Amino acid sequence: MNGENTLMITVCGVSVAALLLATFPAFALDSNAIGRSTAAPDVVLAKIGDFCGIAAWHPAIEKCTLSADGKVRTLALKGGGVINERLEKRDDAAHSYSYSIIDGPLPVANYLSTISVAADGAGSKITWIGKYDAKGASDAEAMKVIDGVYQGG
């Protein structure tokens, strides 16, 4: 292979790598909360695994309405405000689901969160993890808001 072909392959390889990196968002921030329950994972998942069941266990949610296809939930917040969220992935075998925020008053963009339940001795460990960028607020303020949402649930 001559030098010109090697240069062309190198340039193409770098271009492909840059394109791949550009297609995956780099989240600036993350929040998480871990809770424990004496109940078995299946019991816990029955309570928190219903995508629109959040109104039954999160004190900030007044009402949840689910779209006909079950993929979008509209959350009416106590005190006013609405958040629309999309179910991105559900894995019942792994006791988890992931969702994104479509729109709402939270100071975040590119938000993706996963709630999962795992066996923990005779009980369960509940993990709520979110990755996002701050929008219209500082990183610290966005993290404070999302951390508060997670701790409240």
Residue ranges of model-derived segments:
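Bacterial N-terminal signal peptides that target proteins for export
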Residues: 2-14
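Bacterial N-terminal signal peptides
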Residues: 13-23
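Hydrophobic ligand-binding cavity/cleft-lining segments
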Residues: 24-66
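Residue-level marker for the onset of beta-strands and adjacent loop->beta junctions
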Residues: 31-33, 60-62, 71, 83, ...
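Extracytoplasmic/secreted envelope proteins and their assembly/folding machinery
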Residues: 41, 45-51, 58, 84, ...
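Hydrophobic pocket/interface hotspot
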Residues: 44-48, 54, 73, 87, ...
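Hydrophobic-ligand binding "helix-grip"
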Residues: 66-67, 76-123, 131-133
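A conserved amphipathic terminal alpha-helix motif
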Residues: 125-127, 131-153
